[in-house]
């Protein structure tokens, strides 16, 4: 995979710097990771070369990220993050100068496209690829640099907004408008910029990668949204005056629309079938379609009301709904499996990789059978 190759190249680059800094153990770790991601003769030769050299290390192995540990000793104090986080969960653990630089880059981004590193014409697949790469890189359990948590939230919010067609359209129109930012109390340096995601960054991460990081104890989504919601409520209170009649006149079109919608719903009859038993509407009698043998459930009077062409129409609708459900479930199964495989490769977890490979996709298998039957 191309993403594996890019990640392997990054690991090789880090390993070469470690060799120059006389850190053979660190170099070996990254070279082995690169070889797992994208095997090449060059990496194999470097690993063999390092294994043949005597390693001048003490009895105790050094932690993985030693770069910033040395810097902190030389400076005598820890450097707080840009958002005032110092000495907490992030800065108490080791991190590298590359991680600090990466967090700084995200903080300097002016819009969501720049955060994800994609163009404004990026497709859904481009957004997914960028999010996968960055989410793993900035997750607080992986990246302990100051500000990494905020960067992780920014990446999640960026993807959640841009992957939603309606939100993306609004963002393209108003996202860079200074007055829009000021109206929501955000500057261009703020990660949220007036747009809120419908899902927390941690939930989004779990959706992509089939579960959170092991032993995760970081609550990523702070009360930022609550503050924003409170501000909206406060704005509404400020805008409420003694013009009650004016408000009623403004709401009248919406009330009429709701009323018309409710009446139309009452006039439209419910489907005469369900794909699973629904005693509440009387759909308890099981039937099977003639073409694909799809099970569906109907009421007592179904056989009397639907015969001939009307029955064929109903069964065609049943099969269409069934195929749509299969497609949806198949997509979810593939996403879960792909996310788990990606995590396993990234962390070099052999057990996780084998578990992901064994994960079944029953909906996809059934969908293939149905499609073969339709075209057969």
Curated annotation (Swiss-Prot):
It is found in: Endoplasmic reticulum membrane; Nucleus membrane. The modification Pros-methylhistidine is found at residue 186. The chain crosses the membrane at residues 243-263. Residues 111-175 form the J domain. One of its GO terms (biological process) is protein-containing complex assembly. Residues 57-84 have a biased composition (Low complexity). Keywords: Acetylation, Chaperone, Endoplasmic reticulum, Membrane, Methylation, Nucleus, Transmembrane, Transmembrane helix. One of its GO terms (cellular component) is endoplasmic reticulum. The modification N-acetylmethionine is found at residue 1. It comes from the Eukaryota. Residues 45-97 are annotated as: Disordered. InterPro entries: DnaJ_domain, DnaJ_domain_CS, DnaJ_subfamily_B/C, DUF1977_DnaJ-like, J_dom_sf. Its main location: endoplasmic reticulum. Homodimer and homotetramer. Interacts (via J domain) with HSPA8/Hsc70. Forms a multiprotein complex, at least composed of DNAJB12, DNAJB14, HSPA8/Hsc70 and SGTA; interaction with DNAJB14 and HSPA8/Hsc70 is direct. Acts as a co-chaperone with HSPA8/Hsc70; required to promote protein folding and trafficking, prevent aggregation of client proteins, and promote unfolded proteins to endoplasmic reticulum-associated degradation (ERAD) pathway. Acts by determining HSPA8/Hsc70's ATPase and polypeptide-binding activities. Can also act independently of HSPA8/Hsc70: together with DNAJB14, acts as a chaperone that promotes maturation of potassium channels KCND2 and KCNH2 by stabilizing nascent channel subunits and assembling them into tetramers. Belongs to the DnaJ family. DNAJB12/DNAJB14 subfamily. This is DnaJ homolog subfamily B member 12. It comes from Mus musculus (Mouse). The lineage of its organism: Eukaryota, Metazoa, Chordata, Craniata, Vertebrata. The gene is Dnajb12.
